[in-house]
């Protein structure tokens, strides 16, 4: 069976998570089993005030991060992350099995550059444990992610700003 790595890329607030939410709906309609995590923003009007995470397949909702009132420089400069929940999500990713698709929203500099955060997400990509993996990432990190991906993966780049057809994932 062919192994697929779908890289969903776009800048901050470009629609990566919305694309993944549409994929979740599609997979439910088709009876496709999904594991992983999506991270929708928490909004107060036009202001993003936090980040939630929804764990699949259970659909458990956890509140991952809140905006820092006066953020400093660094990889997660805008957000104060709950470290216990980061660990919980990382463990969840490491414990996944029997999924048609694994979804990871998102892998960022913390994982790719610092090798911290959701390190089990990187293991999924490096080992080709699953046949179909969907990863959200910013454009500046795409080439690094491709370099890390297991050689058995066929890589498909999905740029959300080009309004891709959700069925590309099937």
What are these regions (language model features)?
Residues 8:
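Hydrophobic anchor at the beta1->P-loop junction of P-loop NTPases
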Residues 1-3:
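Phosphate-binding P-loop
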Residues 12:
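The conserved Walker
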Residues 70-113, 117-123:
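Phosphate-binding/switch loop-helix module in NTP-utilizing enzymes
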Residues 24-76:
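N-terminal phosphate/diphosphate-binding loop that engages ATP/GTP or pyrophosphate donors
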Residues 16:
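Conserved lysine of the Walker
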Residues 19:
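Hydrophobic positions on the alpha1 helix immediately C-terminal to the Walker A/P-loop
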